[in-house]
Amino acid sequence: MEQTLSIIKPDSVGKAHIGEIIAIFEKSGLRIAAMKMVHLSVKEAEGFYVVHKERPFFQELVDFMISGPVVVMVLQGENAVARNRELMGATNPKEAAEGSIRALFGESIGVNAVHGSDSLENAAIEVSYFFAKTEIVNSVA
């Protein structure tokens, strides 16, 4: 059973879309194995997005991710990484499939509602960034 990391970003938390987004995951068969709400520090956001450190949007991304609380989740299920990516939709909400999370709740390529791991390898790294193994409950689906 695969696991992937999902983050409901500050824009969606601030607009009270948490429940709607979680419902989309659960209706698709993904289960929540761990979840917490946190307000990331600059250090935490920079550490999480370190792979983008040399990209021109890095500081804007960090500033956005520390602008308010986020909900961090471990989603679990068959093909969890790919299913989460499909449910999220394209990074740019204008290009995201109708009914996808980003099409429904995203505003722009930078303010796009959610983050999701892009591979199994990155999912393992990202999950361990936010959660200890003892915090993850292997749900039975």
Swiss-Prot record:
> Which cofactors are named for this entry?
Mg(2+)
Positions binding ATP in this chain are: 9, 57, 85, 91, 102, 112
Q: Which UniProt keywords apply?
A: ATP-binding, Cytoplasm, Kinase, Magnesium, Metal-binding, Nucleotide metabolism, Nucleotide-binding, Phosphoprotein, Transferase
Q: Provide the assembly information.
A: Homotetramer.
* Function field: Major role in the synthesis of nucleoside triphosphates other than ATP. The ATP gamma phosphate is transferred to the NDP beta phosphate via a ping-pong mechanism, using a phosphorylated active-site intermediate.
> Which family would the database say this protein is a member of?
Belongs to the NDK family.
Q: What is this protein called?
A: Nucleoside diphosphate kinase
Gene transcribed to yield this protein: ndk
